[in-house]
Amino acid sequence: LHYFACRNGEAANAAADAVLTAPDGNAWLARGLAEKAAGRILGDALVWRIEEGKSSVAVDVLSGAKTVRIEARQLIWAGPAFLLPRIWPAMPGGLKSAAQAGDYSPWLTANLHLSDFPEERHGAPPSWDNVLYGSQGLGYVVATHQLIRRRLSGTVFTWYRALHDVAPAEGRRLLLETPRETWAEGILAELERVHPDIRRLTTRLDIFRNGHAM
């Protein structure tokens, strides 16, 4: 809701395209919402069935070793649409067909923790979104770009790749079966083309295998 409905930053000293954001991104929003809803959040839980009644909706949730049923007048589904047919048996046919119509490519993402900003071999200096020409990846973002300090001693690059060049099922298999070290080497080799000292500056490299995109 923030991203699509109230992200524009309007102020006397702000540019027309300014956005309202926080140094730690959506984490700031999530913490604020959690504080307002203290005592009403059920974490570490899994929704496994939704049933719609005449005047209410029942949600069965696996919490620890037991199932809890939550009933409400209305339900907002804030998850991937393709999951709904699996947990909502009575989902209307048209809605179910629409949810199952899409195909979702898996994504590989990585966070590279750097002790300093890397050297630029050529091209523009790092910006928020950086795309390498001719690369299999989607580029990387400088995850510290929202920090307001003038000079940072280190930074984090978040790198993305969608495995769209093969069928989604094959992509997910590759994602799981390819060793972490192989993915890490490929990422470093790609970034090394424009940042020759990236290996020396990388203090940590976290790999994330995602069965589907955001």
Question: What spans do the regions from the language model cover?
Answer:
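Charged, often glycine-rich, active-site loop that binds/positions anionic groups
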Residues: 55-65, 211-214
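C-terminal segments that line or cap access tunnels to active or ligand-binding sites in enzymes
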Residues: 72-73, 79-213
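Conserved aromatic-histidine-acidic binding/catalytic patches
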Residues: 17-21, 25, 67, 100, ...
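Acidic/histidine-rich catalytic neighborhood
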Residues: 59, 68, 83
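Conserved SAM/SAH-binding loop
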Residues: 44-48, 63-64
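Active-site/ligand-binding neighborhood in enzyme catalytic cores
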Residues: 1-46, 56
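Core beta-strand elements of the Rossmann-like FAD/NAD(P) dinucleotide-binding domain
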Residues: 65-74
